[in-house]
């Protein structure tokens, strides 16, 4: 989010470009599955910039500078990051910041997660923290950025304003991000084919740009009347709220100052910075019965009913959320006008959004029925039995046809020409695979060095399947690294929103904690399983039952979950979803994980197909 003065995003002209001949720091970012832009490290950004100078439409092999990013490639022409072993594609972007800001100085702010690992804040939040640190503010309130956290510089800690839990904070010096001067060709900032006359108008960019504008307005307003810094709040009493972070079901927009006083009591929980985005909200002060949780200066808060009755003529009543989730405006944008008007000192009455309905009414055992056309009500997966590993060369040769006279094109894995030796020559040696050999994949026809495909396969799950890095076509049966667990499914006599005359398929996933196997990130180390059993819902119609059958197949292939780092809590070595989205909100769609959602069934079928799970693949 841009900030007044130094440290914010560089100003742009009408076409969305930085002004010419102005120095700025370049930060490359990728969009995670929760629509948060996460920055690459400075080292990776320098590497991307170097490749960009040579070929603005080329590809960047991230593993050349970071061993943890070996599977990843960035295609500069389409502005997407591609993961070779899973086929996952994510948008990337190139952002510009003032050279005097945190990335320009190589300053990184991080918070400590439950596993003791350090997680970097999003770049906009990092810049805000650094600005406050440089101005010698004793503390910083992140409410205006959508997070109910207080940063205390004296103790270098972050405190949750509801649970009072503290986490350690650190400021680390790293390599400064790359500096650039001059105008930027459009192909470096947007995918080829983007509109040439206007900046991007997708919902995500609208949300980001509006949030930046709102933050500027809030800060400008509060600079005129900065409140005194309060004392540190008392430590939480013994036996207080647990430290686990709860997902915030709804958020309240606020015009509170960035330096506003800490709340006197607990409010609703919100995720830590860097967690999945929800509607930006700020926690309120001590909540009392019948009061709306609006943490902003002004008239005394009243109940929503009396507030509506007392709204004077001409004062807009703005919902905190787009409650129905309909229309061209993203739900998170529905209250943005309220923030801007409130920051400008105009009268605004905000109404509270309802809480999501996560679960159906209680159902007796006699009302639970099997799903028609789907045998059984349960599937279990056990610990993966270690089989003799398939020889990587044999797997690659099974799906490849040798090419005697390859074209003078790039191999998109190593970025060397196909007419020359593989970039893995001297790095990887496999008996019988010469570095100059080139092959063509049978179905899709894309060509690569055989040694490059062997390297890609060896870096993946090594399950006997191969995935084309270009078109994501899967050869063989792809399997995952899901831990052992149980999947149950049955009918319940309740309807989902949007399916009034249809019963509901309920899926219950349950995975216990355990020890990681050789296919997991840290073999021999314990992994956690938070939030289980997890309940998910489908309509009991033809397409819903089709999705269920394919989800069962995906479960048996261990593709539904994996072990990694939670984007919600930052916890590492924990069970997380694996690119196949589920609906976990039964009676509403306030979190984006519920109904009505007319495109969900088609979207999840496409996600399953991308994992190699489809009816066509089953018949093949």
Swiss-Prot record:
Residues 379-389 have a biased composition (Basic residues). Residues 291-307 have a biased composition (Polar residues). Residues 227-241, 268-280 have a biased composition (Pro residues). Ubiquitinated; undergoes 'Lys-29'-linked polyubiquitination catalyzed by ITCH. It holds the Pfam family DTC. It is found in: Cytoplasm; Nucleus. A motif (SH3-binding) lies at residues 230-233. Widely expressed. Strongly expressed in blood vessel. Also expressed in embryonic nervous system, pancreas, lung, adrenal gland, digestive tube and muscles. Expressed in MZB cells and developing B- and T-cells. Pathway: Protein modification; protein ubiquitination. The keyword Metal-binding applies. InterPro entries: Deltex_C, Deltex_C_sf, Deltex_fam, WWE-dom_subgr, WWE_dom, WWE_dom_sf, Znf_RING, Znf_RING/FYVE/PHD. Induction: Regulated by NOTCH2. A zinc finger (RING-type) spans 411-472. Transmembrane segments: none annotated. The WWE domains are thought to mediate some protein-protein interaction, and are frequently found in ubiquitin ligases. Functions as a ubiquitin ligase protein in vivo, mediating ubiquitination and promoting degradation of MEKK1, suggesting that it may regulate the Notch pathway via some ubiquitin ligase activity. Regulator of Notch signaling, a signaling pathway involved in cell-cell communications that regulates a broad spectrum of cell-fate determinations. Mainly acts as a positive regulator of Notch, but it also acts as a negative regulator, depending on the developmental and cell context. Mediates the antineural activity of Notch, possibly by inhibiting the transcriptional activation mediated by MATCH1. Homodimer. May form a heterodimer with other members of the Deltex family. Interacts with NOTCH1 via its N-terminal region and EIF3F, the interaction is required for NOTCH1 deubiquitination. Interacts with EP300. Forms a heterodimer with BBAP; the heterodimerization leading to an increase of in vitro ubiquitin ligase activity. Interacts with ITCH. This is E3 ubiquitin-protein ligase DTX1. The lineage of its organism: Eukaryota, Metazoa, Chordata, Craniata, Vertebrata.
